Amino acid sequence: MSTSKLVVAMDGPSGTGKSSVSRMLAQRLDARYLDTGAMYRIATLHALRKGVDLTDPAAIADATAGLPWSIGTDPAGEQVLLDGEDVGEEIRGDAVTKAVSAVSAVPAVRELLVAAQRRLAGEAERIVVEGRDIGTVVIPDADVKIYLTASAEARAQRRNAQNLAEGRGDDYAAVLADVQRRDHLDSTRAVSPLRPADDSVLVDTSELGIDDVIGRLLLVVSERTGAGQ
């Protein structure tokens, strides 16, 4: 396998298997892994803990300006800290999930975190960067750009199954409504709306297992760069 510099931009909406796929792809490529969505979730948790009015962009910007956070890039395990506390589980909770679109839409928050994302990606020799605007905004010159997609129904089924596995109850209708709500917010926001880059490779995961997805992506990386095989 080539050990040359490699940046893979992995974009797409929630529920496409993006996080699991990105971690596994990074491991197969002997690369680092950056979950930019976790960064926005850390900022959201911080704003919630501060009691910030989430309808006030200026207040959100002020609260997150000195965000005391850190995030690891080891694909074998997540490390996300807020004020030195491991918040990996808390940032995946319902409160953060419902609020993250509002926080991530604030231009000052995006500016702060995009700068950090570029720095972390630049420090790595090889890295898979996962998010929603990596190929369009954060790293538009990435070596490989991939956009994972799936139907809203397939994504809701996956998230509902995850909720059941984690003991959060069975409410497919509510999960589907939330998926559709987030899709609308993310695709219509003024700053960095969710969309594939013009030169992204689109992969629909609705009917694919994770091994099938990884196989396709390794082929894409190999075709684009010569790495991955």
Curated annotation (Swiss-Prot):
It catalyses: CMP + ATP = CDP + ADP; dCMP + ATP = dCDP + ADP. GO terms for molecular function: ATP binding; CMP kinase activity; dCMP kinase activity. Belongs to the cytidylate kinase family. Type 1 subfamily. One of its GO terms (biological process) is nucleobase-containing small molecule interconversion. This is Cytidylate kinase. Keywords: ATP-binding, Cytoplasm, Kinase, Nucleotide-binding, Transferase. ATP binds at G12, P13, S14, G15, T16, G17, K18, S19, S20. It is an enzyme of class 2 (transferase). The keyword Transmembrane helix does not apply. It holds the Pfam family Cytidylate_kin. Its EC number is 2.7.4.25. One of its GO terms (cellular component) is cytosol. It is found in: Cytoplasm. HAMAP family: Cytidyl_kinase_type1.
